[in-house]
Curated annotation (Swiss-Prot):
Residues 89-108 are annotated as: Linear cationic cytotoxin domain. The keyword Nucleotidyltransferase does not apply. InterPro entries: Spider_toxin_CSTX_knottin, Spider_toxin_CSTX_Knottin_CS. Residues 45-88 are annotated as: Knottin domain. Its main location: secreted. It comes from Lycosa singoriensis (Wolf spider). The toxin is composed of 2 domains: a highly rigid N-terminal inhibitor cystine knot (knottin) domain and a rather flexible C-terminal linear cationic cytotoxin domain that forms amphiphilic alpha-helices. It holds the Pfam family Toxin_35. This is U4-lycotoxin-Ls1d. Keywords: Calcium channel impairing toxin, Disulfide bond, Ion channel impairing toxin, Knottin, Secreted, Signal, Toxin. Enhances the high-affinity desensitization of human P2RX3 purinoceptors. It is found in: Secreted.
């Protein structure tokens, strides 16, 4: 019986040691993978299109305002030319919300 208890304790010790080694190896691999993904994302990031500039090449490339991202609006100008013109603009509702938030910040401190 003593041998069985001793063998069980030895087995549990070795098992816990091997599982912690495997977890440490897994954690280091996960950290390396996360760092490589972040580096790839930074390389892949592109420059945003400023407000009131042409966004017809990429309609999702508008820059962020203070609180909200600008939206690419497309329209057809008056006249004989029927080409579509797109520009990054701030929606009026976002403009009003930003004004209210600015006023609240000045009042609160």
């Amino acid at each position: 019986m003593k041998v069985l208890v001793l063998f069980s304790v030895l087995f549990l010790t070795l098992f816990s040691y091997s599982s912690t080694e495997a977890m440490d190896e897994f954690d280091s691999d996960a950290e390396e993978d996360m760092l490589s993904l972040m580096a790839n994302e930074q390389v892949r990031a592109k420059a945003c299109t400023p407000r009131l500039h042409d966004c017809s090449h990429d309609r999702h490339s508008c820059c962020r305002g203070e609180l909200f991202k600008d939206v690419c609006y497309c329209f057809y100008p008056e006249g004989e030319d029927k080409t579509e013109v797109c520009s990054c603009q701030q929606p009026k509702s976002h403009k009003y919300i930003e004004k209210v938030v600015d006023k609240a910040r000045t009042v609160v401190g």
